[in-house]
Amino acid sequence: NYHPASEKVQALDEKILLLRPAFQYRDNIAKEYENKFKNQTTLKVEQILQNQGYKVINVDSSDKDDLSFAQKKEGYLAVAMNGEIVLRPDPKRTIQKKSEPGLLFSTGLDKMEGVLIPAGFVKVT
Protein backbone atom coordinates (compact mmCIF):
# COMPACT_ATOMS: atom_id res chain seq x y z
CA ASN A 1 0.00 0.00 0.00
CA TYR A 2 1.99 2.98 -1.31
CA HIS A 3 1.52 6.45 0.14
CA PRO A 4 2.46 9.47 -2.01
CA ALA A 5 5.25 11.83 -0.97
CA SER A 6 2.85 14.42 0.42
CA GLU A 7 1.16 11.91 2.73
CA LYS A 8 3.06 10.43 5.67
CA VAL A 9 2.01 7.55 7.87
CA GLN A 10 2.79 6.95 11.54
CA ALA A 11 6.45 6.19 12.24
CA LEU A 12 7.32 2.54 12.83
CA ASP A 13 10.11 1.06 14.93
CA GLU A 14 11.46 -0.97 12.02
CA LYS A 15 14.69 0.12 10.36
CA ILE A 16 15.34 -0.68 6.72
CA LEU A 17 18.90 -1.02 5.47
CA LEU A 18 19.08 0.61 2.03
CA LEU A 19 22.02 -0.82 0.11
CA ARG A 20 23.93 1.15 -2.51
CA PRO A 21 22.50 0.54 -6.01
CA ALA A 22 24.39 -1.87 -8.28
CA PHE A 23 23.43 -0.86 -11.80
CA GLN A 24 24.88 -2.05 -15.10
CA TYR A 25 25.09 0.60 -17.81
CA ARG A 26 24.84 -0.29 -21.48
CA ASP A 27 26.37 3.00 -22.60
CA ASN A 28 29.74 4.53 -22.03
CA ILE A 29 28.41 7.37 -19.89
CA ALA A 30 30.31 9.87 -17.83
CA LYS A 31 30.83 8.87 -14.19
CA GLU A 32 29.12 12.08 -13.03
CA TYR A 33 25.86 11.02 -14.71
CA GLU A 34 26.13 7.49 -13.34
CA ASN A 35 26.60 8.81 -9.80
CA LYS A 36 23.82 11.38 -10.18
CA PHE A 37 21.39 8.69 -11.36
CA LYS A 38 22.35 6.37 -8.46
CA ASN A 39 21.94 9.19 -5.94
CA GLN A 40 18.56 10.30 -7.29
CA THR A 41 17.26 6.71 -7.36
CA THR A 42 18.45 6.12 -3.80
CA LEU A 43 16.81 9.35 -2.59
CA LYS A 44 13.50 8.47 -4.25
CA VAL A 45 13.41 4.94 -2.74
CA GLU A 46 14.41 6.38 0.65
CA GLN A 47 11.50 8.88 0.45
CA ILE A 48 9.03 6.11 -0.41
CA LEU A 49 10.18 3.99 2.55
CA GLN A 50 10.11 6.95 4.95
CA ASN A 51 6.59 7.80 3.81
CA GLN A 52 5.64 4.25 4.77
CA GLY A 53 6.86 5.00 8.31
CA TYR A 54 10.23 3.20 8.20
CA LYS A 55 13.54 4.54 9.44
CA VAL A 56 16.09 4.22 6.63
CA ILE A 57 19.78 3.49 7.16
CA ASN A 58 21.97 3.88 4.06
CA VAL A 59 24.62 1.16 3.75
CA ASP A 60 27.79 1.60 1.67
CA SER A 61 27.61 -1.93 0.27
CA SER A 62 25.53 -3.19 -2.64
CA ASP A 63 25.56 -6.86 -1.57
CA LYS A 64 23.41 -8.21 1.29
CA ASP A 65 26.10 -10.81 2.02
CA ASP A 66 28.53 -8.00 2.96
CA LEU A 67 26.35 -6.86 5.88
CA SER A 68 27.76 -7.47 9.35
CA PHE A 69 25.88 -9.56 11.90
CA ALA A 70 25.11 -6.38 13.88
CA GLN A 71 23.66 -4.68 10.79
CA LYS A 72 21.52 -7.72 9.98
CA LYS A 73 20.28 -7.83 13.58
CA GLU A 74 19.51 -4.09 13.63
CA GLY A 75 17.67 -4.00 10.32
CA TYR A 76 14.10 -5.17 9.87
CA LEU A 77 14.73 -5.55 6.14
CA ALA A 78 17.59 -5.00 3.68
CA VAL A 79 16.66 -3.42 0.35
CA ALA A 80 18.94 -3.93 -2.65
CA MET A 81 18.60 -2.26 -6.04
CA ASN A 82 20.07 -3.57 -9.25
CA GLY A 83 19.26 -3.36 -12.91
CA GLU A 84 20.36 -2.38 -16.37
CA ILE A 85 20.19 1.26 -17.38
CA VAL A 86 20.67 3.19 -20.61
CA LEU A 87 21.02 6.98 -20.39
CA ARG A 88 20.22 8.68 -23.69
CA PRO A 89 19.82 12.32 -24.73
CA ASP A 90 16.18 13.37 -24.95
CA PRO A 91 15.75 14.29 -28.63
CA LYS A 92 13.10 16.91 -27.81
CA ARG A 93 15.21 18.71 -25.21
CA THR A 94 18.80 18.22 -26.42
CA ILE A 95 20.79 20.40 -28.81
CA GLN A 96 23.95 19.18 -30.50
CA LYS A 97 26.38 21.92 -31.49
CA LYS A 98 29.22 21.42 -33.93
CA SER A 99 32.59 22.37 -32.51
CA GLU A 100 34.64 24.89 -34.42
CA PRO A 101 37.98 23.20 -35.20
CA GLY A 102 39.60 26.53 -36.10
CA LEU A 103 39.41 27.82 -32.53
CA LEU A 104 42.47 27.76 -30.32
CA PHE A 105 42.30 24.89 -27.78
CA SER A 106 39.35 23.32 -29.61
CA THR A 107 39.03 19.55 -29.33
CA GLY A 108 37.09 19.30 -32.57
CA LEU A 109 34.34 17.35 -30.77
CA ASP A 110 30.64 18.08 -30.93
CA LYS A 111 29.02 19.56 -27.83
CA MET A 112 25.64 18.54 -26.45
CA GLU A 113 23.39 20.48 -24.13
CA GLY A 114 20.14 19.10 -22.84
CA VAL A 115 18.55 16.34 -20.81
CA LEU A 116 19.41 12.66 -20.38
CA ILE A 117 16.55 10.20 -19.97
CA PRO A 118 16.95 6.74 -18.42
CA ALA A 119 15.58 3.57 -19.93
CA GLY A 120 15.90 0.00 -18.71
CA PHE A 121 14.86 -1.64 -15.49
CA VAL A 122 15.53 -1.37 -11.77
CA LYS A 123 14.82 -4.34 -9.55
CA VAL A 124 14.24 -3.66 -5.86
CA THR A 125 14.59 -6.72 -3.61
UniProtKB/Swiss-Prot annotation:
Compartments in which it is found: Cell outer membrane
One Pfam family named in its UniProt record: NLBH
Taxonomic superkingdom: Bacteria
Gene Ontology CC, one term: cell outer membrane
Keyword Magnesium part of the UniProt annotation: no
Keywords: Cell outer membrane, Lipoprotein, Membrane
InterPro entries in the cross-refs: NeuraminylLac-bd_hemagglutn (IPR007876), NeuraminylLac-bd_hemagglutn_sf (IPR038531)
Record has Membrane as a keyword: yes
Membrane-protein topology: Lipid-anchor
Signal peptide: none
Region described as N-acetyl-neuraminyl-alpha(2,3)-lactose binding motif: spans on this chain: 92-97
UniProt name for this protein: Neuraminyllactose-binding hemagglutinin
Biological source species: Helicobacter pylori
